[in-house]
Amino acid sequence: MQVTDARNMSAAEIAALMKKKAFDEVELSPRIQAGTDAMFGRHMTAAQVVDQIVADVRKNGDESLFYYTKLIDRVELTSENIRVTEEEFAEAEAIVKPEVKAALERAIANVMKFHEEQMPKTWLTNRPYGSLLGQKVTPVDSVGIYVPGGTAAYPSSVMMNACPAKVAGVPRIVMAVPPGKDGKVNPNVLVTAKLIGVTEIYKMGGAQAIAALAFGTATVPKVEKITGPGNIFVTLAKKAVIGHVDIDMLAGPSEILIVADDSANPTYLAADLLSQAEHDPLACAILITDSERVANAVGEEIEVQLAQLPRKEIAGTSLQQAGKIILAKDMPTVIEMANLSAPEHLEIMTKAPFEIMPYIRNAGAMFLGAYSPEPLGDYYAGPNHVLPTGGTAKFYSVLNVETFMKKTSIIAYTAPALMAAADDIITLAEAEGLQAHANAIRKRVGK
C-alpha cells in the first residue's frame, strides 16, 4: 500500500481526505450491479431494488418473500420449510465441533455478563406535596435479529444481537438468516442461537427478510424492532421500514482506523488492518501515524500478509478501494483526523493509549494497546460489536441493552401538589391558546 503524506495538508484538505460516503451513496460493484440488472431484467439502483422488494412483500406477504428468495438466493422456500425445525437444530449440534461449542459458550458468557452491567432500572422519586415522578423501563415485545450470510457465516452476530435482547427480557426474539445454496443455515449459527435460547429462526435474507419482519406475513409474524448488520440492500430496507418498526441503526461496510506512534509493531498493525479488509470489498481499513518508519513498514508488511490469506481477493479489493496509510505531522493531528473519521472500530496503538483516549470524541468502539486487537471485540471480550459506521459514530451509539428497551415517564400528583402547580399550568396552557388544557386543571382545583 502507498503512504499518503498529509504532513503539509491544510485543515480543509485533511477534512476532504477523511470524508466518507454515506451508506446510501455507496455504489454497487460492477459484478453485483450486473447480477442485479440480470435478475430484474433492467438497470436498477440498490434503492430501487429495495423499494420494489419491500413494497411487494408488504402487499403480497409470503408469495413475494418466497419469490425473491428463489430469485436472489436460488433457494425454494415454502411455509413448511422456512422456519428452522428441531431436527435441523439437532443436526447442527451433531456437526459443530466440541471445541467450537465450548468457545461459543465462553464467549456468550462474556457477552451476557457485560450487558448485564448495562441494565437500566425503573425508578420513582418523591416530590413536594406527596407527588411521585419516575421512569418505567420495559423491554420491547418482540425483536427481529438479522444475521448476515453471504461470503461468511457469523455466529458472533447472533451473540451480539441476541445476548443484549435476552438480558433486556424481550419475550419474543426472532432471527432471520439467509439460507445457503442447500437451503440450510450454517450449523455454527444455529448452535449459537440455541445456546442463547433463540429458537424462532427463519431462513430468509436480504430486503425481503426485513420487509417480512416489519410487516409480517402469513408465516412470519411481525416484530416491533429490527437489529443487526447487513449489506447495502439490508440497510436500505431497514431505512424503508422505519416508522412501521424501530431499528437499531443504519450501518454500512465495516471499518477500522488505527492510531499509531513510533512504538507500534508494524506486523500487528498490518494484521489488524487486514482483519477488517477481509470482511467485504467495500470495507475500509485506515492507519494514521506520525511515524514515517511505521507507515512505510506497514505498507510493506500488508503485502506479505495479504498474499497468505484465503480471502486475499476480497481483502485486496477493499484495500485498493478504501484502504489508506496516512502520515500526519504530529499526534494531535492524528487524533483530530480520527475524530473526523468517526470510525466503527478505533485501535489506539501508542506508547500511552490511555493518554490518547480522553481526546477521542467519535468512535463506535475503542481498542487500547497492542494486546487489544479488534477481533477480540468481534468475538469474545463482551462489549457489543454492532457499531455505527460511515461516520455515524458522531451521533449513534453501540448496540446495547437499552436498544431493546423502552422508557415510559411516570407522573402521580396528589390534590395538594396539583393545586400548588395549577396557576402555572393554566397560564402556560392559555399562552398556547389551548383552553381545554387549562379547563382540565380548573375542573379539578376549582379555579
Model-derived features with residue positions:
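General beta-strand structural signal in soluble alpha/beta enzymes
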Residues: W123-N126, I145, M175-V177, E200-G206, ...
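Flexible, glycine/charged-enriched surface loops at secondary-structure junctions
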Residues: P120-T125, D246, A283-I288, Q308-L319, ...
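A conserved active-site cap/scaffold subdomain adjacent to cofactor or substrate pockets
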Residues: M249-Q321, I325
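C-terminal core of ALDH-fold dehydrogenases
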Residues: L340-K447
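N-terminal Rossmann-like NAD(P)+-binding subdomain of aldehyde/semialdehyde dehydrogenases
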Residues: M1-D141
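Conserved small-residue-rich beta-alpha loop and adjacent elements
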Residues: T125-V191
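Conserved NAD(P)+-binding/catalytic subdomain of aldehyde/semialdehyde dehydrogenases
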Residues: L195-Y268, D272-S275, H279-C284
